[in-house]
Amino acid sequence: AGDAVELRHYVTGAKTLIALAVPANKQGRIAADNICGGSSEYRGSQGSSVVKVFSLTAAATGINEKTARAAGLDYDKVVLSPANHATYYPGAQVMTMKVLFERSSLRLLGAQIVGGAGVDKRIDVLATAIRAGLTADLLKDLDLAYAPPYSSAKDPVNMAGYLIDNLVAGRVKQFHFEDVASLPKDGSVTLLDTRTPLE
Protein backbone atom coordinates (compact mmCIF):
# COMPACT_ATOMS: atom_id res chain seq x y z
CA ALA A 1 0.00 0.00 0.00
CA GLY A 2 1.09 3.56 -0.62
CA ASP A 3 1.31 6.25 -3.26
CA ALA A 4 4.48 4.80 -4.84
CA VAL A 5 3.18 1.30 -5.60
CA GLU A 6 1.91 -0.19 -8.83
CA LEU A 7 -1.85 -0.63 -8.93
CA ARG A 8 -4.64 -1.58 -11.33
CA HIS A 9 -6.27 1.28 -13.23
CA TYR A 10 -10.01 1.13 -12.71
CA VAL A 11 -10.84 2.14 -16.31
CA THR A 12 -8.30 0.15 -18.35
CA GLY A 13 -7.48 -2.69 -15.97
CA ALA A 14 -3.80 -2.12 -16.76
CA LYS A 15 -1.08 -1.91 -14.13
CA THR A 16 -0.06 1.69 -13.57
CA LEU A 17 1.39 4.16 -11.09
CA ILE A 18 -0.98 6.75 -9.63
CA ALA A 19 0.94 8.72 -7.02
CA LEU A 20 -2.00 10.21 -5.12
CA ALA A 21 -2.97 10.26 -1.45
CA VAL A 22 -6.52 8.94 -1.96
CA PRO A 23 -5.55 5.52 -3.39
CA ALA A 24 -2.76 5.24 -0.79
CA ASN A 25 -5.18 5.86 2.07
CA LYS A 26 -7.72 3.40 0.67
CA GLN A 27 -5.00 0.75 0.36
CA GLY A 28 -3.93 1.41 3.95
CA ARG A 29 -7.49 0.90 5.17
CA ILE A 30 -7.79 -2.32 3.16
CA ALA A 31 -4.48 -3.61 4.54
CA ALA A 32 -5.66 -2.85 8.09
CA ASP A 33 -9.02 -4.55 7.46
CA ASN A 34 -7.26 -7.70 6.27
CA ILE A 35 -4.74 -7.67 9.14
CA CYS A 36 -7.70 -7.57 11.53
CA GLY A 37 -9.38 -10.57 9.92
CA GLY A 38 -11.51 -8.85 7.28
CA SER A 39 -11.54 -9.60 3.58
CA SER A 40 -11.42 -6.17 1.93
CA GLU A 41 -10.24 -5.98 -1.68
CA TYR A 42 -8.74 -3.06 -3.60
CA ARG A 43 -10.70 -2.39 -6.79
CA GLY A 44 -8.27 -0.01 -8.48
CA SER A 45 -7.98 3.72 -8.95
CA GLN A 46 -9.13 6.01 -11.71
CA GLY A 47 -6.70 8.76 -10.74
CA SER A 48 -9.19 11.48 -9.83
CA SER A 49 -7.23 14.63 -9.10
CA VAL A 50 -7.57 18.39 -8.79
CA VAL A 51 -5.03 21.21 -8.62
CA LYS A 52 -5.21 24.98 -8.24
CA VAL A 53 -2.96 27.00 -10.56
CA PHE A 54 -3.24 30.68 -9.62
CA SER A 55 -6.89 31.58 -10.39
CA LEU A 56 -7.61 28.39 -12.34
CA THR A 57 -8.53 24.90 -11.24
CA ALA A 58 -7.63 21.85 -13.33
CA ALA A 59 -9.08 18.42 -12.63
CA ALA A 60 -9.12 14.97 -14.19
CA THR A 61 -10.56 11.53 -13.67
CA GLY A 62 -10.25 8.28 -15.60
CA ILE A 63 -8.02 8.26 -18.67
CA ASN A 64 -7.01 10.92 -21.18
CA GLU A 65 -6.73 10.64 -24.96
CA LYS A 66 -3.08 9.61 -24.92
CA THR A 67 -3.89 6.68 -22.64
CA ALA A 68 -7.00 5.74 -24.64
CA ARG A 69 -4.96 5.63 -27.86
CA ALA A 70 -2.17 3.62 -26.21
CA ALA A 71 -4.77 1.12 -24.94
CA GLY A 72 -6.18 0.76 -28.46
CA LEU A 73 -9.63 1.93 -27.42
CA ASP A 74 -12.10 3.14 -30.05
CA TYR A 75 -13.17 6.31 -28.28
CA ASP A 76 -14.80 9.61 -29.02
CA LYS A 77 -14.92 12.84 -27.06
CA VAL A 78 -16.89 16.00 -26.57
CA VAL A 79 -15.40 19.35 -25.66
CA LEU A 80 -17.64 22.06 -24.27
CA SER A 81 -17.29 25.36 -22.46
CA PRO A 82 -20.28 25.90 -20.17
CA ALA A 83 -20.53 28.45 -17.38
CA ASN A 84 -20.23 27.24 -13.79
CA HIS A 85 -23.65 28.70 -12.94
CA ALA A 86 -26.54 30.59 -14.53
CA THR A 87 -25.04 33.40 -16.60
CA TYR A 88 -27.71 35.90 -15.54
CA TYR A 89 -26.44 35.56 -11.97
CA PRO A 90 -23.33 37.71 -11.34
CA GLY A 91 -19.91 36.09 -11.36
CA ALA A 92 -20.40 33.26 -13.86
CA GLN A 93 -17.12 31.73 -15.04
CA VAL A 94 -16.51 29.54 -18.07
CA MET A 95 -14.98 26.10 -17.66
CA THR A 96 -13.72 23.90 -20.48
CA MET A 97 -14.64 20.23 -20.22
CA LYS A 98 -13.49 17.23 -22.22
CA VAL A 99 -15.34 13.95 -21.72
CA LEU A 100 -14.11 10.71 -23.33
CA PHE A 101 -16.29 7.69 -24.00
CA GLU A 102 -16.06 4.37 -25.81
CA ARG A 103 -17.91 4.52 -29.15
CA SER A 104 -19.51 1.07 -29.11
CA SER A 105 -20.65 0.84 -25.49
CA LEU A 106 -20.78 4.56 -24.53
CA ARG A 107 -18.78 3.59 -21.43
CA LEU A 108 -17.32 6.68 -19.80
CA LEU A 109 -13.53 6.60 -19.96
CA GLY A 110 -12.39 9.90 -18.49
CA ALA A 111 -12.76 13.64 -18.21
CA GLN A 112 -10.62 16.72 -17.83
CA ILE A 113 -11.87 20.17 -16.78
CA VAL A 114 -10.14 23.55 -16.51
CA GLY A 115 -11.81 26.69 -15.17
CA GLY A 116 -12.63 28.62 -12.05
CA ALA A 117 -15.32 27.87 -9.49
CA GLY A 118 -17.21 24.59 -9.76
CA VAL A 119 -14.56 22.49 -11.53
CA ASP A 120 -14.07 20.26 -8.48
CA LYS A 121 -17.80 19.60 -8.18
CA ARG A 122 -18.13 18.53 -11.82
CA ILE A 123 -15.08 16.26 -11.83
CA ASP A 124 -16.42 14.51 -8.71
CA VAL A 125 -19.77 13.91 -10.43
CA LEU A 126 -17.99 12.50 -13.48
CA ALA A 127 -15.70 10.36 -11.29
CA THR A 128 -18.78 8.94 -9.56
CA ALA A 129 -20.46 8.27 -12.92
CA ILE A 130 -17.38 6.37 -14.14
CA ARG A 131 -17.18 4.31 -10.93
CA ALA A 132 -20.93 3.57 -11.05
CA GLY A 133 -20.68 2.34 -14.64
CA LEU A 134 -23.02 4.95 -16.12
CA THR A 135 -22.91 5.30 -19.88
CA ALA A 136 -22.04 8.69 -21.32
CA ASP A 137 -25.52 9.38 -22.66
CA LEU A 138 -26.99 9.01 -19.15
CA LEU A 139 -25.13 12.11 -17.95
CA LYS A 140 -28.01 14.15 -19.38
CA ASP A 141 -30.43 12.41 -17.00
CA LEU A 142 -28.56 13.07 -13.75
CA ASP A 143 -30.72 15.00 -11.29
CA LEU A 144 -28.21 17.52 -9.92
CA ALA A 145 -28.79 20.34 -7.45
CA TYR A 146 -29.65 23.72 -8.99
CA ALA A 147 -29.87 27.30 -7.81
CA PRO A 148 -28.56 30.24 -9.90
CA PRO A 149 -25.51 30.94 -7.68
CA TYR A 150 -24.33 27.30 -7.95
CA SER A 151 -25.31 25.86 -11.32
CA SER A 152 -27.66 26.10 -14.29
CA ALA A 153 -30.93 24.26 -14.79
CA LYS A 154 -28.86 22.09 -17.12
CA ASP A 155 -25.64 21.54 -15.19
CA PRO A 156 -22.38 21.40 -17.18
CA VAL A 157 -22.33 17.62 -16.62
CA ASN A 158 -25.86 17.39 -18.05
CA MET A 159 -24.73 19.51 -21.01
CA ALA A 160 -21.91 17.04 -21.71
CA GLY A 161 -24.53 14.27 -21.72
CA TYR A 162 -26.79 16.19 -24.10
CA LEU A 163 -23.88 16.79 -26.46
CA ILE A 164 -22.91 13.11 -26.39
CA ASP A 165 -26.54 12.08 -26.94
CA ASN A 166 -26.82 14.44 -29.94
CA LEU A 167 -23.54 13.15 -31.37
CA VAL A 168 -24.47 9.47 -31.00
CA ALA A 169 -27.96 10.05 -32.45
CA GLY A 170 -26.46 11.80 -35.48
CA ARG A 171 -28.13 15.13 -34.72
CA VAL A 172 -24.77 16.91 -34.77
CA LYS A 173 -21.40 16.30 -36.37
CA GLN A 174 -18.38 17.61 -34.53
CA PHE A 175 -14.96 18.74 -35.61
CA HIS A 176 -12.12 19.08 -33.14
CA PHE A 177 -9.08 21.30 -33.24
CA GLU A 178 -6.95 18.48 -34.62
CA ASP A 179 -9.44 18.02 -37.50
CA VAL A 180 -9.10 21.56 -38.86
CA ALA A 181 -5.94 20.90 -40.88
CA SER A 182 -7.66 18.07 -42.78
CA LEU A 183 -10.80 20.04 -43.70
CA PRO A 184 -11.25 20.75 -47.44
CA LYS A 185 -9.72 24.01 -48.57
CA ASP A 186 -11.89 24.32 -51.68
CA GLY A 187 -14.35 26.79 -50.16
CA SER A 188 -16.88 24.11 -49.21
CA VAL A 189 -16.16 24.61 -45.51
CA THR A 190 -16.53 27.89 -43.64
CA LEU A 191 -14.90 28.27 -40.24
CA LEU A 192 -16.90 30.56 -37.97
CA ASP A 193 -15.64 31.60 -34.54
CA THR A 194 -18.69 31.58 -32.27
CA ARG A 195 -16.88 32.19 -29.00
CA THR A 196 -18.20 34.89 -26.73
CA PRO A 197 -15.85 37.54 -25.30
CA LEU A 198 -15.91 35.61 -22.00
CA GLU A 199 -14.68 32.48 -23.77
Located regions from the model:
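Charged, low-complexity surface segments at secondary-structure and domain boundaries
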Residues: A111, D124-L126, L142-P148, I164-V168
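Acyltransferase loading domain of fatty acid and polyketide assembly lines
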Residues: K140-N158
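Short hydrophobic beta-strand that contains or immediately precedes a catalytic carboxylate
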Residues: T190-R195
